[in-house]
Design a protein with these regions (language model features):
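Canonical Radical SAM [4Fe-4S] cluster-binding loop centered on the CxxxCxxC motif
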Residues: 1-19
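Glycine-rich, proline-tolerant flexible connector loops at the mouths of alpha/beta enzymes
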Residues: 4, 8, 36-48, 99-100, ...
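Alpha-helical scaffold segments that flank or form the walls of functional sites
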Residues: 17-31
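Charged helix-capping and loop-helix junction motifs
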Residues: 19, 49-54, 108-110, 141-145, ...
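Conserved SAM/AdoMet-binding glycine-rich loop
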Residues: 30-116, 120-128, 134-136, 197
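Conserved C-terminal portion of the radical SAM core fold
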Residues: 37-39, 61-63, 110-168, 181-198
Length: 198
């Protein structure tokens, strides 16, 4: 998701409407729980948010439960999306408060938490979790999960790093991500945040 990334992926501004609505139909036809739309970027203009809201209204006509991964929103922008019918927003903590500066320099951990709290106050369901394997300690994993316990997200994704060529973490050492360790992280997440979908 970084403009500095050299990963070999397709790059485009927006998915075209035909594909977006076709994907939405696929969700409904296969009785999937929700349609999650991912947008790469940290901030969007009000015009871009209005454009997204128009598409959300169209998809909500079919009763789809919609989630967006959309970066930071102003309260005004969040209200536009809420009124359009957006149900859930994904905004991951990614790591612990103390380790966060090692993985991100564009904003702070505190800004992420504040964004999530604002979204919760507006009535959005929250999807928030983290990435394991970026060089953090076991204590960092625990600290992140304790922060998530305070947030109580409806969904808590636990991602395990898969180093991708062309990204800053392409040479990350993930030898510690054994099956046993990954299962322990998932079990700890379940114990600390028992009501969230993992």
């Amino acid at each position: 998701q970084s403009c500095r990334s050299k990963a070999e992926i397709d790059k485009y501004k927006w998915v075209d409407d035909e594909k977006l609505y076709k994907d939405n139909d696929f969700v409904n036809e296969n009785h999937l729980s929700r349609h999650c739309i991912g947008l790469s970027g940290m901030k969007f203009t009000d015009a871009e948010i209005e454009d997204l809201a128009k598409r959300i209204r169209k998809m909500k006509e079919t009763g789809t439960h919609l989630c967006c991964s959309i970066g930071f929103l102003t309260e005004h922008q969040a209200k536009i999306l809420k009124e359009a019918g957006l149900d859930r927003i994904n905004h991951n903590l990614n790591s612990s408060r103390s380790y966060y500066p090692n993985i991100c320099s564009t904003h702070t951990f505190e800004q992420r938490v504040a964004n999530i709290k604002m979204l919760q106050e507006l009535g959005f369901e929250i999807c928030s979790g983290g990435i394991i394997g970026m060089g953090e300690s076991k204590e960092d994993v625990v600290d992140m999960l304790l922060e998530l316990r305070e947030i109580q997200p409806e969904a808590l994704p636990i991602n395990f790093l898969l180093p991708i060529p062309g990204t800053p973490l392409e040479h990350a050492d993930i030898s510690g991500l054994t099956t046993e360790y990954c299962l322990k992280v998932l079990c700890l997440a379940r114990l600390l945040v028992p009501k969230s979908d993992i």
